[in-house]
Each structure stands twice: as C-alpha cells, then as structure tokens.
Amino acid sequence: MDTRDDVTLAKVPAPVAVYCGSVPRTSVGLRAPPPGGIDSSLLAHDEASLQPVSSVLPSSEKPSQLSREHEDQSSLMLNAPLKGWQARNGYPRGLGVLPLGHHLGAAIPSLESEASSVARDTIQIKDKLKKRRLSEGMAASSQASLDPVGGPRGVPLRSTIPRTTSQRLLRVPRPMPPIQSIPTTPEANSAKEKDLDPPGGRQDLQDPGASAQEVQISRQYLHCADEKMHKSLGGLVIPPIPKARMPTGTSSCRPGSLPSPLCPSQDVLMGPKAPHTRLTCENGPLEKTPKSPASKPLVPVVKAKSAEAPETSLASSQSTFTLTAFSSHAKETRSLENEEDQKESSTKVQVTISKSAQEKMRLKQMKEMELLRRAKEPEWERELVSQGLGTRRTSAKEGLLPLRGSGALSEPAGMSSPRRNNMGALQRKRANRASLPSIPVSKQEPGFARHASANSLPAVLTLGSPEWEEEEEEMDLRALRELRPFSNPELGLTDALQCLNSNDWQMKEKGLVNIQRLAACHSEVLGTRLHDVSLAVTAEVTNLRSKVSRLAISTLGDLFRVLKKNMDQEAEEIVRCLLQKMGNTSEFIQRAANRALGAMVENVTPARALVALTSAGVYHRNPLVRKCTAKHLSAVLEQIGAEKLLSGSRDNTDMLVHNLVRLAQDSNQDTRFYGRKMVNILMANAKFDAFLKQSLPSHDLRKVMAAIKQRGIQDNHELQSAKGRKVSKSLVVCENGLPSHEGVETSEQLRELTRLLEAKEFQARMEGVGKLLEYCKAKPELVAANLVQVFDVFTPRLHDSNKKVNQWALESLAQMLPILKESIHPMLLSLIIAAADNLNSKNSGISTAASTVLDAMMGSLDHLCLLQAFAGRVRFLTGPAVLDITDRLSVLVASVYPRKPQAVERHILPVLWYFLNKMSGNGVLPGRGGNVRTAVCRLARSLQEQMGSRLQDFAASQPQQVLKALQGLLASESLGANDKVIGGRMAPDIQMTGTTCPQQLD
C-alpha cells in the first residue's frame, strides 16, 4: 500500500498550442521554409527544440485528474483520443500504425540503453536535446529541479529556447471553434469508458496548484505577439493539432507497428511529438513538415506492478507514423481525384445553354406536360411506336413527345466515390440544372444528322419538301384528336378568351391551346361565341412572336376542320388574314397558312370559299399570295364544277372569267398554270360556248384560249419545272431521306453566287456577275431551273450605283440572252425596264451596253412578247429611251403583224394614238424631252405598210386632232428622206434586217 510519502514520478506533457478550427486540404510534403523565416540558431538545434521540457509530478496523482485539470485550464483533454481533421476529411483514423519518420532509428537505441534503470531516465533529457548542445549549467539546473529527494518541487521549468525565438516559432492565430474529440478506434472507445487507468492507480494530486502554475507558466511561451511571428516566418503559421492518444490495451506489437522500447512493467505517459507546422507564404500555400524526433519518456518512472504491463502506452511508436501516412494518403487521394475527373470529362458532354434557350426549353416542357396528360396515352404511344422515326421526331419538335434526355444530367455508372459523396456543393450545382436536357454523344445513329439546336428542324427533311408538309399535317390532326376535354368547358372558354386578351405571349399561347381543346372536345360550346373566338384567334395571326402566330394559324385550321360550315360567316375575314401571312418570309409560317387555307376549302361551303379567295387574293400585289390563291381557287372550282359556275348570273360569270384570265396571264409561272387550268375546266363544258356568244370575249380571254389550244402540253411541263425549281432551291432529297450530292453542290453554288451578288464591295459584285455568266455558259440548265431566284439577285446589278458593276452587268446580260433564250421570259419585263432606263445614262459605255441588250433581245426572244412589253413601257420613258424603243416597235410591227394582227392592233395602235394626241406641232412631247416626230413618223409608216387602209379606218374612231396628225405624217414628203437616216444614225430596219427576217418568214 503506497503512502503519501512515497513519491512516484510521472511524466506530464507540457501544454501545447491547440488548433480549434478546420484546416484546408492542401498538398502535403516536405518543403523548405522561406529564407530568413526562421532563426539560424534553430537549425543547429534541429526542430526538437519545439518540444518543451516537462515537469515532475508525483506518481500518486491520478492521470485522469490531471487530465481534468488540464481540461479546465487549456481545454486540452488527455487520456482521450481527439478527432483529427484527417478523420473529418475522409482519411483513415488509425494513423498510428502508418510508417514513421526517419528519427525513430536514432531514438530506439537510446531508449533501450536507458530503460534498464529508473535513475538513468533523467539522462533521456540529454538524449532528446543532444543536438542542442546544452550547457552544463542548464543540465545541472534541470537535474536539480527533477531530483525527487532534494531540491524544490514544483519549480517551473523554463524553455531552453530563447523567448523571442519561442515566440516566433509558436505564434498562434486567433482561437477558433474547438474540435470535438472522437475516439479513433473501437479499442480507444472501450479504453475511454474504463478511464484508461489501472484499478487502484488513482490517487489525489498532492499539489494541484503547483502543477496548474507550471502549466500556466509554460503556456506563456505559446502566446506571443503576432507582429514578431509574422516578421520572422513571413506567413501564417498554423499551430499543431494534438494527436489522439492511442489505446494501450495490449503490449504485443500489431502488424505494421514497431515494438515499444520500454519494459512491460514500466508505465509511461508519453509526451506529444514534434508539431506539424504549415506555412502559408505569399507565393501560395507551402507546408513545412519538420523531422519528427521519436517521443521519449520525459521523466523516470517507478516500477509498477506487473499487472499494469498490458496498458503500456504505444503512443510513442505509433504517433510518429502520422506525417508520412498523411502525406502518402493525400497523394493517393489526389491522384484518384484526377483520374475520376478525367474519366468524368471523357464520358460526359458539358452543355452550356443561354438563358433564353433555357426559358424556351422550360416552356416547351410545360407544353409537353400539358399535352401528355390525356386519357388514352398508352394507345397513342403504341400508335407512335408503329410509325417511323420521322414522325416521332416531328412529334417531339411540336411538343407532343418529351425531349430525348430531358431531365437531370445523368451521371455515368461507376463514378461514385467517397470524394464524390463529400462534394455536396458540386452535386447541388448540378442538381440545379435538372431542367436542362442532356445531349448525349450519339454514336449509334450515323445515318441521321444531329439537330442544330433545341428548336431547329430535323436535318433529315428540308424546308418546303412534300414529306415535311405531309408529316406536319398528320401531326396537327393527331394532336387535335389527342387533346383532353375540360371538366367545365364554359369556364374554359371564358379563361381562354381572357388569356387571349392578355399582353403576355405565354398567356396567349395558353389561350390558343385551350381553344384547340374546346374545338376538339366541346365544339358545341364554341358555337355560342364563335364570332368572338374567331376574332380573338385571327388577331393573334399577326402577332410579332412567330410561335404565337403559327399556333393561331393552326388553331384556325382546327376550327375549320371541326366546325366546318359553321365557319362560313367568318371565312372571308380569316382568308384575308391568312393570305396576308402567305407573304411572310418564314417558310414554316407559309406552310401553316397554306394548311389552314386547305382546311377552309375542304370544310366550308364552296361558294363562300370562292368569294373569299377571289376578293382577297386575285388582285394582291404579292406573287406568293396570288399563287396560293390560284392553287386553292382551282380546288374550289373542281368542287363546284364548270356547269354550276356557268349556270349562274351573267355578272357573276363575267367576273369569274375575268379573274381567271387575270391569273392565267400572271407573271408567276405557277399562278399562270393554275389560271389556265381553271380556264380549261370552263372550256371543256358545253355551256362555255353559249357564254362566249352572249358576252363579247376580251382579247385576253382569246389569247389565253389560243395559248391553251396551242401549248396545253407545255403548261404541264411548266408546272413541273416550277415545282422542280422549288425543290432544287432547297436540297434534293433522295429516297433514303438524305440530301443527294448534286443537290448539296447546287445549293452551295447558288448560296455562294447570292453572297457575291449582294456583297458590299463592288469587286465582289463584279465577281458574282462573272460567275453567273460562267454558269450560263457551262450549266445553263442550272440557271434556268433557278431563274427567278438567281435573277432576283442579279437584276439590281443592272441599276448598280457603281458604274463599273452596272456596265459589266449589262454586257454580261447581252451574252446570257442568246444562251437562255425562251427560259428568260418570266423575268423579261424587269430586264426590259432595267435596260430601257439605262438608255438615258450619260455614261456612253452604259448606254451602249443597254442598247446591246435590247438588240440581243430582238435577236433571241419571241417578238410577240417583246412587242407587248415595249408597247407597255414606252409611255413611261423619257429622253433618248423613247426614241430607241419607238424605233424598235416599228421593226416589231413588221415582224409580228403577219402572224398576230390582233396583237399589233391591241398594243401598237394605242401607242400611236398616244403620240399623235400628246405631240405638239413641232414634234415635241410635253414633259418628255426631245423631238419624237421622226420616230412617230417611222412607226406610222410601218403600220401603214402592214395594215393598209385599215389604219385609216381605226383612226376614224379617234378624235379629229389625231386623225389630222396621222394624215399629215403620212402625206409628208420628208418621210421618205428620213427612212434611211434618223438623227444621224442608220435606220433600225436596216440594222435589224438580219435578225427580223427569220421572224418574218414565220
């Protein structure tokens, strides 16, 4: 039984700085401190000087009580393992079993040599401080303070390092929140529960005040001025974190650990090892990992009972493994992170979408959810499965199918890891983008092109292709059938009208969808307020947002399909609005309007459709509108029939025939085809002859009838070429749904030609004109098939502001005309206007080139077409252009009259009457400039030669002034002298003799 006089010495660790906060995970490794950061004297003493000298306490004092004393004063709990920041960051907790530093080899022999005797334990202080070269006086004072018999007890020990150096090395930042202590192993948990003290070993401390004083005095070296430490180290020093005390449940060596150098009968309190110091410098985070000297017993201990042997501490042999283990573990973890990042970046496609695109995607998904909630969804899905890939793509485009890959960005399988589980912020960031669709890397569909964007058209089908139009129409019908009904349709109608009256385009879109649902499921409810609904929907056709406009057009088509003849009263206003949208440049708007007009023609009363189309589209200035009108009007005539049309009132029949003749003579090739087709339908009926007898047919009607009888087969070819032109305008689609090589090449050539002709630099425009001339010589069929598209861009170059481009375009046109010949007819009028305007140019080169163009027309094109075009243009010309065109009319009269006398009488005689009526006595036209008497005399003489006395008969019906002027011109003696020379130039008949003779032979 021990008494209070029996003094048992115990080793107590000196207080150290406790870091109570989180430590950033930075790279771990031994790095040199910055120059001048640490006193040079410290390097000589090595870093073992960082470990303070411990004081002596009686062995009777209980370690647990000492632990509580330390906890009260420095918040440091001994005998209980602390939770290191390694465990907080996913590192293994049992760090004591990892490899140790390189100082262990020097510490083990020293400990083995001194462990045989209790008295020699005091020499361990020298072994520990052997690199410091302690003075003999300091060693003597240390032995005196540690003598258990003599000398004062409880004398506070002072550090062997100078105060300034200690303060510089052990500077700590402001205290941070404490770190909770958690046992690192199950054995430590059990040891903590048992207080880790042997039974009977707990004794009260003899002088707790003295020990507290020692601890307090020793702590003064840890709290020093921040300025001094900052100056010495040049950065932030993160204080050491106390290591958890390892369990001592067994004395046997575990695998991977070194055996304890102490005897089993020795009970030693091990002091903490050298701190792990980090330096944060200006260039970046650097870490200094000093060499960790082996922990040694600080004071000799008295031999205890052999029963206490299993609890011998292994902290000295285990805690020194920590730094090496942490460094290697951090490197392995970082390499794993890099591998995972590389694997993730190689298997995932990062998608960046703008905010506007995200909003569009969100709205499209809302529409999908609205359309997908329907009663017969499984049946509809089975129907879609049976259809082809193109139909599914079309349905997905219109919002009837969910986007492929919509939802959260999927993470590849096998990518889960402990690091990924700890990255909560990154996962939340990815989760916030769940509304965006993932775009997978498609490697299994080489036969189809990717979509250009979320809202782009499928690359398989081209704009304007019949396949695309048919699938859009099928999609509209399917969507109409699958719309779900309202539980309260009256309330739904009211809500739809309110939405259409809103200023928000999204609300308008919702209202249009509700109208479609009402039309599909509650058509009787719409009938009560059909006029209001029709006006509201028609008003949205002209919406500036194309999405709303197209949806409104589709809604009108649905109303026509469902309500049929109930829409008769609204047809005229709707047709006018839809035809106006046909002039829109957006092809998808044109297709939607065309389908809606087709639904109107098929479902309303044919008479209503006939009136609506003729009143709104026949006289429209846009050629696309007239073409669409002629197409649908032809379908209406086929429904009504020629007999019923000719059986109506005379005024209505005359108006109808007049409109059809106007369409048959339209400048657009397709419009002319449909117009002639309708006239041919009327001509095939027997009542048409009776109509001709009752009403005097106009010259236009006779001309159209003659053209149909002579070139009826050519009209079919005209339509085919027009349709072929539309297909070649985009891309030629092969049977497999992919564009052919020829179609792609043609499209690229036309695109490049258009770019050059519309360029800002005049050199590029001249290059474009030259390229067009090359195409006409090498590939005339290419230019002829795309004539309207090409010459719409080329014609402005005939009026180009740059004189070089203007002259070069006229000269090139003169070379193109003999190559293209009759295929140039659709653009003839615009070319004649451009050439005639250039005749008045002050630039001699431009005026000469314009005259050359007119000569090429006279030699290459049909004189009948030229006669009509020249006669219509001459009244609007001034200056030299009037003289030139009038002279050419004189030549055309001699060529055309033998074949088409009616054409001359209809077109040339009005021109002659105009000149004779407006011309003054000296031959000057007021406001036109120049003397035209000679040119008019030339024209009158040519008509007199061809018509003879009939010219006088036609003149008798004109005013007396015109008749006298004509007689004066014909009787003039100077007329023969002016036949050869007109204004110093050779007469046109002599110039054009070679070109007009073949025409005269006809």
From Swiss-Prot:
Where do the segments described as Disordered lie? 54-74, 131-214, 332-351, 402-421, 426-450
Domain of life of the source: Eukaryota
Report the GO terms under cellular component. microtubule cytoskeleton
Recorded GO terms, molecular function?
A: microtubule binding
Residue pairs linked by disulfide bridges in the UniProt entry: none
In the record, the note on similarity to other proteins reads: Belongs to the Crescerin family.
Which protein are we looking at? Answer: TOG array regulator of axonemal microtubules protein 2
Organism name: Mus musculus (Mouse)
Q: Which gene encodes it?
A: Togaram2
